[in-house]
Amino acid sequence: MENTFKGSKNYVASPELMNAVNIAMALKKPLLIKGEPGTGKTMLAEAVAEALGKKLIIWSVKSTTKAQDGLYVYDVVQRLYDSQFGTSGVDDIAKYIKLGKLGEAFSADEQVVLLIDEVDKADLEFPNDLLWELDKMEFYIPETKETIKAKHRPIVIITSNAEKELPDAFLRRCIFHYIEFPDQQQMEKIIRVHFDHVDETLLMKAMQAFYYIRSIDSVEKKPSTSELVDWIRALELTGVDTSRITKEIPFIGVLLKKDKDISTVQRRLRR
């Protein structure tokens, strides 16, 4: 394969994840990534772009996002404003067409990585509305009677937090991979990527406390990898006595963001 992803210096990818990325690229299909928050779904696209030396274009999906937003926007208000004030060139509609993120990816002179982030935040029709464009790698702008065709097929990575079920027709067109939460061995590798040097005792105690919290079924919002990184950084900066880490879990608010979860863990520690 021309492009092969083998991870990057800033991203620890499992062999299964690397295979999924490479298969999606070889088959020229979007890669749909699911996993709980903090498992590195968004960072994967950054890592692929970095490893392959390609530009990254990010389309962050919101609840109000429509598929049309990713193609282009016709600024009819600006055109009307210009026409009222006699601005020259108002008849050139192309001046008022702004490409969206998908349009940018199609128009790029070199292949890019396109991240469609948190696709499930939009309404249920959003993924289906993208099927034609992602299949055919083109779209039509009726205002200018122009067809935008991809100069180079982008590497498309789509993330989902599983807030909504995605349409079957959309799923059939994707390569799917679920990122499992890292086990302790893989998590240790991830932590070492973020720190040039970390005290071994501090790391061992922090990992022990972190996975203990995650093992408590009644904790509703379990801490993620990014919160563990922040917590270890806080422990280092304050020079906390490492013997306190598993007994008290200092700065617990870095790990847990719900009062109920903090109370649950603190009750367990007092037993």
Provide a role label for each language-model segment.
Residues 1-271:
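C-terminal regulatory/interaction module of P-loop NTP-utilizing enzymes
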